[in-house]
Amino acid sequence: MRFISPALALLAVTWHTVPVSPKGSLRPAGLHRPDSADVVAVAEAFHAALAAGDPPTVLRLLAPDAVILESGDTEARAEYAAHHLAADIEFVRAVPGTREVTGVRVEGTVGWVTATSTTRGEFRGRTIASQGAELMILSRIGRTWLIRAIHWSSHRL
């Protein structure tokens, strides 16, 4: 059994609903928004899918070769799906938190979003009080932005 690190606290976020176009498209509704808004919308949709307990949407937003870096470990998308996605969903749904996007940048077909978070609550009998940081790197393939890498880090408050 893997220890749930404080870095998971970054996942427990409060989000507003992000409209997604019908038929499960990865592109949010409002097709004419600037790229930076689209990049942020994909990051928000990822967190909203975690909070909703929606693994298929989480995985659709991750590129097939995506990597997740957390607590000194690196996982490929398939490893994340098989080993930690369910625990991340459980954590996000159990522990309240806030998240704030602190930056977004787009250079051609690559974009990145930085965010910070604060999470407080209890999870599996442990008190959680942490501050987190997130970096998501996305790439645009055609008109679709996909998450290529996520780096989560956190520390106790």
Label each PLM-derived region with a short phrase.
Residues F3, L11, W15-A29, W112, ...:
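Short beta-strand edge/turn micro-motifs at domain boundaries
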Residues F3, W15-P64:
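Short, low-complexity N-terminal intrinsically disordered segments enriched in polar/charged residues
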Residues A43-D54, L62-A66, E70, H84, ...:
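Sec/Tat-exported extracytoplasmic proteins
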Residues F46, V58, A66, Y80, ...:
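Hydrophobic pocket/interface hotspot
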Residues L62, G72-D73, A115-T119, H151:
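A mature extracytoplasmic/lumenal domain signature
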Residues V67, A82-I128:
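Surface-exposed, charged secondary-structure patches
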Residues R77, G121-F123, H155-L157:
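A short local loop/turn or secondary-structure capping micro-motif enriched for an aromatic residue
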